[in-house]
Amino acid sequence: MRLPVAARVYVGAVIVLGAAIVAGLLPSLQFPHPSLFAGLLALSVISSALKVDLPVGVGSSCISLSYAVDFTALLLLGPAPTVLIATASAWSQCSFRMKQRNPAYKTIFSMACLAVTVAATARVYTVLGGTYGQLASLQALMGAAMAYFLVNSAAVAAAFALANRRPVFEVWHDNFLWSITSYVVGAVAAGIVVEVWQRIGQWEASLALLPLCLTYRTYCIYLKRIADEQRRVAEWTQLHRESTEVLAR
């Protein structure tokens, strides 16, 4: 499907902005904890493939556990390494377990969206007093989580809205607002990981992923029920249409 001009301009602008952010962060890229970076990178790529399709009415979208991993990386490593981790997770999410192959521009757009999201989240986190490598105040943690949710969901919703010529806020409100709980849970889990990492060690910190696994499983069940309900409604609608046509003859 050929995108409307407004959608193409928007997608192109986000890609350019994302590329500029990555290029701007590369000079400050450091790996003081290479094993931690490698572990979070692998975990983010793997968890991004464990995605749940969202029943949006304007296209296809999904959520995954990679958000919490990326958020944890931001708290522990800072924005530069996290941008690499987040863009890799976006690539994985758009490349694996797909019902149909994504066009290249969608994959690049998703990667750019996460680069922009990480940069904005990092800015909010530091403005609220957060520091990397140690757990900050609840205000900084929740503020950063809300920034991540708002920037990421709004960026994706805008793309869907422009592609389908619908109001951006309507698309965001109807299809993305409800997922805010997953971001709150992810931020709390990331905070627990950082705290346990500092006090005990990295292997014990992995226990904080249990709430995320439960959240993921809950979403799977919930969205499966929505999909089943939508299928039943479609079947009844089709049956009603066929019955009406028969009676009209």
Which residues are covered by each model-predicted region?
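Short helix-perturbing small/polar motifs within transmembrane alpha-helices
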Residues: 1-174, 178-203, 209-217
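Acidic/His-rich, divalent-metal-binding segments that scaffold phosphate/diphosphate chemistry
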Residues: 206-249
